[in-house]
């Protein structure tokens, strides 16, 4: 079995936040959130990281992030560009929005041939998540089904005081396997608990605190990249017709299709750790405070890459 690889999705545009939050420092040493994730992954056993970025940020990204990690881990860069489409497909004129997380991952198909974990660059998952991913990926292989894993977080640990968020709300069976994910695009804190709305805030449905949600923290066997490739044209046929400027090939949607087709299982491992992220600029202070506190507790050294 090959050594698992960490894939970090860092090509997104950060539309709600403004600016390149993938590289935005969250401590006095200049580390970004993704430095902490890569550090946690390295401690868990990962030896190689692949960053999915855009050509436009390559120089800055290599200079600010890559350079300090390269002495400690094998680093590769993959580029998610709009025009990376199958033969016969074209980007609609005027479209600037990337084609989503499934497309980002598909861009890795020529450099990754091992089990892999996938994370968002701008989410903080905590050391335990990476240990669970590494342990799973080094002990599980596909049999007659694809065998995947997802690290879920309790919704109460993933919402911000500063606005609404989008979360994949998970239904899990009694054996801890994923039944379905429902993307709720507007969840916010209302009083003591989280709630979602489907009608622009006219009515709200509460979500219990311990409900597991997906934060794009997955573990896949190598064959998943082929699945993404095989399913992409059908997505484009539909998406480019219905929403040419906005359609996105979402990673969880592809997983959901495989579950419906009974071709895969996804074991859900719940992390009780708090998730941190900067969806809104106002979130940054709480992330910085949390990082500072974890350093004081000895979870992280002052400088990660010394």
Predicted regions: what they are:
Residues 2-66, 73-75, 80, 114:
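N-terminal glycine-rich phosphate-binding loop and ensuing alpha1 helix
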Residues 69-114:
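Short phosphate-binding loop-to-helix
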Residues 87-98, 163-168, 282-286:
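Short, surface-exposed amphipathic charged segments that create phosphate/polyanion-binding patches used
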Residues 114-124:
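Short beta-strand-to-loop acidic/aromatic patch adjacent to the donor-nucleotide binding site
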Residues 127-215, 222:
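Conserved core of the sugar-phosphate nucleotidyltransferase
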Residues 221, 280:
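Short, conserved phosphate/pyrophosphate- and ester-handling motifs at nucleotide-, phospho-/glycolipid
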Residues 229-264:
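A C-terminal functional module that forms or caps the active site or interfaces directly
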Residues 283-306:
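Generic C-terminus detector
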């Amino acid at each position: 079995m090959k050594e698992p690889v960490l894939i970090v999705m860092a090509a997104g545009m950060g539309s709600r936040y403004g600016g390149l939050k993938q590289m935005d420092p969250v401590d006095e040493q200049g580390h970004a959130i993704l430095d902490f994730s890569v550090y946690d992954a390295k401690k868990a056993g990962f030896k190689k990281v692949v960053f999915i970025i855009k050509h436009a940020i390559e120089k800055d990204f290599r200079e600010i992030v890559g350079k300090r990690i390269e002495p400690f881990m094998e680093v590769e860069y993959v580029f998610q560009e709009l025009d990376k489409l199958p033969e016969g497909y074209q980007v609609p004129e005027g479209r600037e929005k990337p084609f989503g997380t499934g497309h980002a991952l598909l861009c890795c198909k020529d450099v990754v041939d091992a089990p892999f974990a996938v994370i968002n660059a701008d989410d903080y998952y905590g050391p335990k998540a990476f240990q669970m991913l590494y342990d799973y990926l080094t002990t599980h292989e596909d049999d007659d089904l694809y065998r995947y894993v997802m690290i879920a977080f309790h919704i109460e640990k993933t919402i911000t005081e500063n606005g609404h968020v989008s979360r994949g709300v998970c239904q899990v069976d009694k054996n801890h396997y994923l039944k379905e994910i429902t993307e709720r695009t507007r969840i916010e804190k209302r009083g003591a608990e989280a709630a979602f709305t489907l009608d622009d805030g006219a009515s709200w449905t509460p979500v219990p605190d311990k409900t597991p949600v997906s934060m794009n923290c997955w573990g896949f066997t190598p064959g998943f990249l082929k699945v993404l490739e095989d399913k992409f044209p059908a997505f484009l046929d539909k998406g480019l017709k219905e929403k040419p400027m906005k359609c996105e090939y979402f990673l969880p949607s592809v997983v959901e299709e495989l579950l419906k087709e009974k071709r895969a299982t996804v074991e859900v491992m719940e992390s009780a750790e708090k998730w941190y992220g900067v969806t809104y600029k106002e979130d940054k202070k709480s992330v910085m405070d949390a990082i500072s506190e974890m350093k004081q507790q000895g979870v992280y050294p002052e400088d990660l890459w010394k």
